[in-house]
Regions:
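Active-site C-terminal subdomain of aminotransferase-like
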Residues: 120, 125, 168-260, 269
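Distinct, well-ordered alpha-helical segments
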Residues: 102, 156-164
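Hydrophobic beta-strand scaffold residues
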Residues: 86-87, 145-147, 289
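Conserved N-terminal alpha-helix of the aminotransferase class I/II PLP-enzyme fold
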Residues: 1-42, 56, 66-72, 78-80, ...
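Conserved C-terminal alpha-helix-loop-beta "cap" of PLP-dependent enzymes
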Residues: 58, 250-335
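PLP-dependent aminotransferase-like
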Residues: 55-112
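Active-site phosphate-binding strand-loop segment of PLP-dependent enzymes
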Residues: 95-149
């Protein structure tokens, strides 16, 4: 990082004001076809701010969130305890939600959030036409459509569309710079110039106007274009992996076909057993198969997440087959 800063004559920002920060905000906004952007220290703050502003602008505090929304699962009820907005659940917990789900709410809402892709259900994406139907309906009904785009870089590859194509029709977008991009942390909120100006005020009110953003921005900006260029390769490797998984009936991927370079694998074991197998394989074969298995709805079944990135790209095909062979044999032995 230090050498990159020296090579590019980077100077520190002061409370978010600095050439690098503004250049990076403009670069991402242009890529997504949005008017303006602001770098935010956390995605939690970015999304709560976006949805709060959407509600204030419509004098309606109701927001539609899928049951697997990060806001509901991982943010300690911030929307409720900090009095940002009220939540209505939308859609099937195990599927992307649709425009019919939106219509079925039966009451006016100010905003709806869509996560692209939906991490908690294996990186699923709505069909492209289904997403466009949601965009059209929200525009017609004056519903602020916000994207949780923490991993939208993956979504664009899954759709075979540009980032701008995916973002068009959303009133605001949040993106992350440590997921996929590999930065130290930080996020960006994008929208209209007026919306972002208001967001900056609210971020300052919440303690988000940190003195120096440069280290976070540098860690993302220095590798941003390179990481984006690698995303199609990750998706191609995922397609290859899905073909290989067809030969292992003990391993069930969700979704059934690749949507992005993220997937969940279901295996016929309790989570404790699967995690024990993971540890043993790591010790005996030097292969770390997954982070953590969690129990699924059915007894004796668990699932874990696979992210197809640099490590799986660098691993020889035969090495991947060996790892799956070892896992499949371990599952069979545990079932006896």
């Amino acid at each position: 990082m230090a050498q990159w800063c020296a090579d590019h004559q980077i100077a520190h920002d002061v409370y978010g004001e600095g050439a690098l920060v503004q250049q990076f905000e403009k670069q991402v906004a242009t890529m997504l076809g949005m008017e303006a952007a602001v770098f935010c220290i956390t995605g939690t703050m970015a999304q709560a701010t976006a949805l709060r502003l959407a509600c204030a602008g419509r004098s309606n505090r109701r927001v539609a969130l899928h049951p697997t929304s990060h806001i509901l699962k991982h943010e300690r009820s911030n929307f409720q305890l900090l009095d940002h907005f009220h939540v209505l659940h939308i859609g099937d917990p195990f599927r992307p939600w649709t425009v019919d789900d939106l219509k079925a709410l039966g009451e006016p809402i100010a905003a709806a959030q869509y996560e692209l892709p939906m991490r908690e259900i294996g990186g699923q994406l709505p069909a492209w036409d289904a997403l466009n139907a949601i965009k059209t309906y929200c525009r017609e009904q004056n519903i602020h459509l916000h994207m949780d785009g923490a991993r939208m870089w993956e979504a664009a590859c899954g759709y075979g569309k540009s980032l701008q194509d995916v973002a068009t029709g959303f009133d605001s977008v949040y993106v992350s710079f440590y997921k996929d991009i590999g930065g130290m942390g930080g996020s960006m909120l994008l929208g209209s110039a007026r919306f972002i100006a208001e967001a900056k005020i609210w971020m300052q009110r919440q303690g988000g106007n940190v003195f120096r953003r440069t280290p976070y921005v540098v860690s993302a900006a220095m590798q941003f274009e390179k990481r984006l260029a690698e995303m199609p390769t990750y998706f191609q490797r995922t397609v290859w992996l899905y073909e290989l998984l067809k030969t292992y009936p003990q391993l069930t991927p969700n979704p059934a076909t690749p949507h992005t370079n993220l997937l969940h694998l279901y295996v016929p074991l309790a989570a404790e057993t699967a995690n024990g197998i993971r540890n043993r394989i790591a010790k005996e074969h030097g292969i770390w198969l997954f982070g953590r298995a969690v129990n699924a709805a059915l007894p004796g079944q668990c699932m874990f997440e696979w992210y197809v990135g640099d490590q799986l790209l660098q691993m020889p095909d035969d090495g991947v087959r060996k790892a799956l062979d070892v896992l499949a044999k371990s599952i069979a032995a545990s079932a006896k």
